[in-house]
Amino acid sequence: MKVPFKWLKDYVNINISANELGDRLTLSGSKVEEIISSGDEIQNVVTGKIEKIERHPDADKLVVCSVNIGKEEPIQIVTGANNMKEEDIVPVAVHGAVLPNDVKIKKGKLRGIMSNGMMCSEKELGMPESGVDGLMILPSDTAIGKDIKEVLDLDNAVIEFEITSNRPDCLSVVGIARETAATLGIKYTMPKLDYTPKNKANIKDSLEVEIRDDLCRRYMARGVKNVKIQESPEWMQERLEEAGVRAINNIVDITNFVMLELGQPLHAFDGRQITSNKIVIEKGKVGEKFATLDKVERTIDESVLCIKDGDRAVALAGIMGGLNSEVKEDTKEIILECANFDGTNIRVSSKKLGLRTESSSKFEKDLDPNLVEIAMDRVCHLIEELDAGEVMEGTIDIYKNPIKERNLKVDSNWMNKFLGTDISKEDMKEYLDRLELKTDVEGDTLNITVPTFRSDIVLKQDVAEEIARIYGYNNIPTTMFNSVSKRAGKTLKQHLEDKVVEILIGSGLNQSISYSFVSPKIFDKILIPKDNDLRNTVKIKNPLGEDYSLMRTTTLASMMEALSRNYSRNNSYARLFEMGKVYIPSQDEKVLPEERNTLVIGMYGEVDYLNLKGILENLIEELNIEKSSYKRESEHPTFHPGKTAKLYVNKEFAGLLGEIHPDVLDNYDIDEKCYIAELNLDVLFKNANIEKKYKALPKFPAVDRDMALLVDDEVLVQDIESIIRNKGGKILEDVKLFDVYKGAQIPEGKKSVAYSIVYRMPNRTLTDAEVNKVHDKIVRTLENNLGAELR
């Protein structure tokens, strides 16, 4: 935000330079980005009196002037201007002078006559043109030889501030004046607000206002009759120009002036155009066309808040007025609007419409609704002062939920301990009073009343920040901590997550990351039925778009998107995993959704179900999860029936793994088989143990036996393994499946499964007879229970 230094001095008596003030304000928390001095572009231009004018001997349109610039001898200047006479005082750019736009002046000959400089016009000095064609003629009592910047008061600095979103009270010249006064320990003066309605007509008799949406927190309207549209006074135009705002006419300029001065946007409607005598504040209609003051027709929708004349939009609330209610040269009656709107809605609407204005940039920060009346009074005062019209009697003010001051109690001893200072409570009170935080001291307690314009002060820590910045951060002594800080370590969950990543990358997988918000269309793509609980989602109020409008309840679609993207780019294989969250809504709206930590693994290309299962078994083993089992799953719509399993850990459901249903693959344009596992990490981590346990190497040899069985295709390998472990007894050390085969030499409807079995006792050597007895028992049980045949 740009604040002209001269304008700032209208409200606070500053006796230091703009640069020094910038340094002081930056140290007190109001960051100064840049200080621009308008006079820096002008160098070596002084006032001079024309003592003699003679015709140029070789040019009819040129004259030769003798100009006194306060030196011992006058200088000679050749010019083509013709609006000056002898004894006139003019700006003179001498040899070596610099003018705006980096124009350098050098002495030289014009048609054979030496010219030692140039006499300047208003345009050449970069000043607003008054309409005079030719040189700038200065008052006759102007001192000779003076720097033109001093004479014309051109040496005005503009200070540019970076205003953070939590300080909307600083989005104005008065707000910066308040900060300046607090920083320098002096008083500041509020602008005059008093006025007397000169027109006895009451606006309440001719206008009605209705707020139909809570996005408008307050709306105030006043009327002005017998309006005189004319140019604003020079001082106002100058202030606006310095702040980067173009002067238009007195009414528009007054509203812009007050917006910059107090930080509260206002708008003036041509009273003739409010034909329904009723202003309505409500959202627009889908596809509604509306032409704004910049003469651009825009399409609005039901999310954009509008100011309407009955059913007809006349302004985009908080953004820009409409061309259909613009104040014109023949306007005789205006309706003044001063309101407060929801900042989030203004920001979203402004972005959607591609229209960001000075007004919207202020409303985006959530302004204080109590500023509305102050700004309206100020506008009425200026209309009266500039004789721009007659303010009507009465005020329409709709303010349903008034914002009130906040009260805080802070212990002064806590404050010093928190800041590491030794500030007296009396000084604390003084610092807070400077910032208009009215403070009473009661013992060691500071009773603070926070004004409504300081919405950022909520906690005692916020008060501490205010005291620290006025006291001076640079004045706070450097001290050692009173306590010993301990370096924070990772949580068990973080260690487990790191372990999972390490295991899966070691298994040849690549980690992927996807958005947690998804499209409603994903459920159809992965064949989730309409009544399935997975479709009960958390909906985002302000989504980036429909494709990102829901919080996901499953990671299956996210992984399918990743596999599809790889497949579409002709990658012959993909091995991916992602650790993320799914969001399960609570039945009670007051309870936050459950955030479930999830691991999803996806792959295609020269892999099968057993590859995926092997990765999971390795993961379970590395996490030291003791009891895991699998059960057939045939009902999940996303997976191929008969080629899917449920994983249980300690009898608790931990996830699904299997081959993806062909119809799902078609929906993602994938022509290869894909395999996915979706696991509940919370269940895995609850049963994991990453502490390393060591045991002595076995002292006695093991007996290894391989077993190849012919079984029906429907027999689960888990059932086979369960029998082996149960019947193996205490001498069984380990059992592993190492082959599953179907094809040549295997009857139809059958499969061959092969296991490696290890027998061992920790305290003695096993005999062949002992091993054979147990091994034969296992084979008989498999034959009797599962119809297995030993190959």
UniProtKB/Swiss-Prot annotation:
Domain of life: Bacteria
Residues annotated to bind Mg(2+): D456, D462, E465, E466
Keyword RNA-binding attributed: yes
Domain FDX-ACB: 698-791
Main location: cytoplasm
A GO CC annotation given for this chain: phenylalanine-tRNA ligase complex
NCBIfam families: pheT_bact, YtpR
Protein name: Phenylalanine--tRNA ligase beta subunit
Native source species: Clostridium tetani (strain Massachusetts / E88)
Annotated gene: pheT
